[in-house]
Amino acid sequence: MIRMGGRKMNPNNRSEYDTIKVTPNSELPTNHNQYPLADNPNSTLEELNYKEFLRMTADNSTEVLDSSTVKDAVGTGISVVGQILGVVGVPFAGALTSFYQSFLNAIWPSDADPWKAFMAQVEVLIDKKIEEYAKSKALAELQGLQNNFEDYVNALDSWKKAPVNLRSRRSQDRIRELFSQAESHFRNSMPSFAVSKFEVLFLPTYAQAANTHLLLLKDAQVFGEEWGYSSEDIAEFYQRQLKLTQQYTDHCVNWYNVGLNSLRGSTYDAWVKFNRFRREMTLTVLDLIVLFPFYDVRLYSKGVKTELTRDIFTDPIFTLNALQEYGPTFSSIENSIRKPHLFDYLRGIEFHTRLRPGYSGKDSFNYWSGNYVETRPSIGSNDTITSPFYGDKSIEPIQKLSFDGQKVYRTIANTDIAAFPDGKIYFGVTKVDFSQYDDQKNETSTQTYDSKRYNGYLGAQDSIDQLPPETTDEPLEKAYSHQLNYAECFLMQDRRGTIPFFTWTHRSVDFFNTIDAEKITQLPVVKAYALSSGASIIEGPGFTGGNLLFLKESSNSIAKFKVTLNSAALLQRYRVRIRYASTTNLRLFVQNSNNDFLVIYINKTMNIDGDLTYQTFDFATSNSNMGFSGDTNDFIIGAESFVSNEKIYIDKIEFIPVQ
């Protein structure tokens, strides 16, 4: 789906979904003892009831992050990625000016300044400031880039609208001049977004500027000949584009890792900040650089159907800052997150509920104490995968919610507390609404985990505040950016409660591995439904949009896949291309259920002790074509024998229509 609307902002410069506000994180007033009842030993819990306690804690409530700044930056990042995903590949040249106009409205809107928001976002995330001289210079450069890019887009629009026989030499010279000015301005301005000591702080700014530069450079390949550029000039632009794609990608990944590693710590609070940086830089930087290779129109000569399979984590559902010292440790949370695995889909959650008694029977509530998760592998397997148990098992009735076939695009979780005269406070999640969408039936519905017993209402956490929609021009069930994929619980120290948190994946993930009849279809290798014992899934390097397959020994069947094709796609034949990195030359093969057998030769791209960088990945293409019959649309990837110490990484498989 092509989304041209961008993000509509309300008069307060907030997304309209922002009006669905959650109660801010609460913390105890600094002029009170940490435990309010201890301030006045003559107070009783009856005198200091729940509402009074909540009023006291709300007097000094603060949001850890400025939600307006963060949501504006994250929302812009999500919107830009969503727009580009809908149009990547050469066919979008036909609607290029309308895309550019929508794109310009996203990154340079008339009623907001996303670039300032990008800078402020990282300042908050890592608690550092950009020096005023560096910020002012960067903003001035961005203003110049906007002017140049808008002039070029207007000229391109006029050029494309003019009949070919009415295009003059003067107009040809003019658009070449404006293209060259804009391109050179980007090239000369990029160092202003990579100022020494501020590389991490400028990271989203750098990524967005780099993306715009590469989008622009692509046009030399699409229009260069009709603009009157020589073949040598066009080739020079192409080589520059390839070089800068590598340079920009490596810069973003390197400084993302520097920033992330600087936030590693030992406490619960440190993990929350670490994870926020990881999530928001994924949405504004890493998701964007995944798209850079698609601007190579010689490699992607058709439209592209692709998907982002990476996981991101919303904040733990925990709204009381006074209890942060009782949260799980940094390492216990990070180590409990699922290790890299084949992609799977949320099938259901089994909730366990426990009673949290209040003082003298008052202020008692039930809470989400633990859970199992059921998932299913990618299409091709009917297995159900049951997770380990997370949290505390219960003696209360168990509640199961089934999401099979539904896409959960929003969660709203309510929380509660119980306070005791000795100052102890206990926390729990009492209710969660899961908004879901069945895109096959075009139906929306809501399922609810309900503990059935509440004390009051401390606050709520709405996933939309952290994962805004791609656009506000459509209903949320159509415009959502992410879908729920997993749920875990962590036990608080001193038995103070349980903290759940959710894992999400991008909306572009295709449940059915659908092969397009006209576009190049990218199938991430993690969408296989089975692996051989000689293969495993490892963490991706940051620029692939997901994890990788690591091959440690040869096998006739490294990975098994099932795909879906409509009648037009079944009539098509496809050349197969694999994106990989390898320390050795090797012969791979692809065989489908029609017994089409394709051989793919891969060459060494890296040394045995080398790191995975953009340059270490290459493409290898099959020596012939394959088709599918429609009866059983399965295929396997295999590999001939190789020395066991060698390393082979596979990122994606591409099906390129040839008819």
UniProtKB/Swiss-Prot annotation:
Keywords: Sporulation, Toxin, Virulence. One of its GO terms (biological process) is symbiont-mediated killing of host cell. Residues 1-41 are annotated as: Disordered. Residues 22-41 have a biased composition (Polar residues). InterPro entries: Galactose-bd-like_sf, Pest_crys, Pest_crys_dom-III, Pest_crys_dom_I, Pest_crys_N_sf, Pest_cryst_cen_dom_sf, Pest_cryst_dom_II. Toxic segment of the protein is located in the N-terminus. Promotes colloidosmotic lysis by binding to the midgut epithelial cells of Coleoptera. This is Pesticidal crystal protein Cry3Ba.
